């Protein structure tokens, strides 16, 4: 079987036209030469990022020794930025300090970019969150199964590009077992008693299909197809 695409195809023309969409003032609807910097309170450290970005290797006290994806920094570089750009950032709670439940912590995102009109812009977004205890019911009610599955898929793809697929599948299974033992209700040594609340019940199904999906199992898929599917996943919004 052969897959091919030509410059005359309607789909290619639509995609090329989309790249040059302009706003009401005639400027391109994208940003260039982008940097994203993260600063946060001392109890939180940044582990890394997954998405269309590269690490600038700017280490300081905010950066965790544990690296995930593009890590070892609190500043990342992007070639372009659009309303579909989506990056997953990973954080680690510091073990050095004991935080009080209900106290606040802050994460600030500082984005600098060159606008379509060639002006230099800077936007600052600050998010405030509350600490909760390890057994707080707010962890259960606040869990987003779809976002968690999307992030785990990105992590799995990041790993499978460096390790063997069966090793990544074993890692997914191990993480799912850890997830179930932490959030499931069960009587030890009695599998029939295992239950997950409705806020967690879909997540194991997502992992079941992920380990069998074209993102991980690339048998009978061309490198172009594999790259396409994985690129589409990187555009998924983590709502």
Predicted regions and their residues:
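Extended acidic, low-complexity intrinsically disordered regions
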Residues: 1-239
